[in-house]
Structures are given as C-alpha cells and as structure tokens.
Amino acid sequence: MESSNLYSKLLNAPKNAPVFLSQNLEADFIVKAYTFGLFPWTSKPVTWWCPDPRCILIPNQIHIQKNMKKFINLYQIKLDYDFLKLITLCRDTRSQSWINDEFITTYYKLFTQGYAHSLELYENNELIGGIYGLILGKVFFGESMVSIKKNASKVAMIKLCDLLKPYDFIIDCQVYNQHLEFMGAHNISRKEFLNILKEKCNQESGFKNFKDLIT
C-alpha cells in the first residue's frame, strides 16, 4: 500500500480499537509501522493500534515535582547496557503483560539493529528500573517502563528528557494516563501526530550512538 493511501486510511481508522491484526511480529515491519504511528499491543494475535488522541511528551516541557528532586541523582544511569534484561523485567513485574517471548525476541533484534534502545537505572549494580523504546529520526517511541524501587520509572523519564532536550525530539507515550500527565505529557490529535511523524522520522537524530549520550 502506498504511503498516501495508508495515511488516509489511518485518519479514518477506529479511535480506540485495533487498526488491524497480524499473527506474527517482524522487526522490519515494526520499523515501518512506527513511522505511521502504529504500535503492537497484545499478542496472539498481535493487535496494531493508532489511537486518537495520541499522548506525547516534549522533553523540554517535562514537569519535575518537588518531591522527585531527591531521587533524580539517587540511581546510576546506563544506556543500552542490558536491553534484554530490562525488557524481561518489564514483562516479569506485571501480572498480565503483552510482552511475551516473541515480543522480547523481536525487540531484541531491533536492539541489535540499532533501532531499539534502553535507559536503565541501577542501585548497587542491581537493575531497579528504566524505559525502552525505538528511536526513528527525532522521535523516541516509548514502549514500556518499569520501577522496582520508588519513583525509578519517573527518574528514567526525567533522565531521558534531559538527554534528548538538545536534539529537538518528541517522545511518543502512546496512550494517556494520569502519571504521564503529571510529568508534562499531553494529548494531540492523531492527524497532528501523523504529520509530526512525517517530519520528525525523516530527520537525523543529531547523535551517532544513543549509548554515548552519557559517559
């Protein structure tokens, strides 16, 4: 399907329901799908979503609550250090999770290809939280966060915003929740989001390696 036709179909797709289903996850297709605002959610079958409205966060608009300041420098940050362990932790800390073995295998492949990335938080060399997602152009497509210690996922988002601020990124948060709103995320229309992707996904990120953003 041509890009213009897919764009038109997505504008008229269900606002709060899957756009289509697939039996499997394929790394190459995921990369293409993300550039059109699609993401997988649930498995067997895989459901693909492009919700309207869409929740995004602009890094320089991050809200840092006063009670968070004491946590910001409490944990050690590592980038792309143990992606596989982080995504597995995201699965294992949820009673019900769409992150099954196929998801982990496919996203780890995307990690080895340089698309998927992780920001991990450690305390005494123990992984206690983080966030992972895809970077395409100047968009960080957030997939999942995890927090073992208090406020670890919030710290991860704050640190991610700090790292991406100089590069004019947006962060796709997919679906609104109050936790994200408190941090500065907001909803925009699907049409506006898809137009942003047209521009941002075709730009250079501004850095060579995500893991080198901290030393």
Curated annotation (Swiss-Prot):
Compartment(s) of residence: Cytoplasm
EC number from the UniProt entry: 2.3.2.6
User: Which reaction is catalysed here?
Assistant: N-terminal L-lysyl-[protein] + L-leucyl-tRNA(Leu) = N-terminal L-leucyl-L-lysyl-[protein] + tRNA(Leu) + H(+); N-terminal L-arginyl-[protein] + L-leucyl-tRNA(Leu) = N-terminal L-leucyl-L-arginyl-[protein] + tRNA(Leu) + H(+); L-phenylalanyl-tRNA(Phe) + an N-terminal L-alpha-aminoacyl-[protein] = an N-terminal L-phenylalanyl-L-alpha-aminoacyl-[protein] + tRNA(Phe)
In Gene Ontology terms, what is one molecular function of this protein? leucyl-tRNA--protein transferase activity
Task: Assign the protein's first listed, main location to one coarse class.
Answer: cytoplasm
InterPro entries cross-referenced by the UniProt entry: Acyl_CoA_acyltransferase (IPR016181), Leu/Phe-tRNA_Trfase (IPR004616), Leu/Phe-tRNA_Trfase_C (IPR042203), Leu/Phe-tRNA_Trfase_N (IPR042221)
What superkingdom does the record give? Bacteria
Annotated Gene Ontology cellular components are: cytoplasm
- According to the record, the segments passing through the membrane are none
The family assignment reads: Belongs to the L/F-transferase family.
Instruction: State what this protein does.
Output: Functions in the N-end rule pathway of protein degradation where it conjugates Leu, Phe and, less efficiently, Met from aminoacyl-tRNAs to the N-termini of proteins containing an N-terminal arginine or lysine.
Instruction: Return the protein name.
Output: Leucyl/phenylalanyl-tRNA--protein transferase
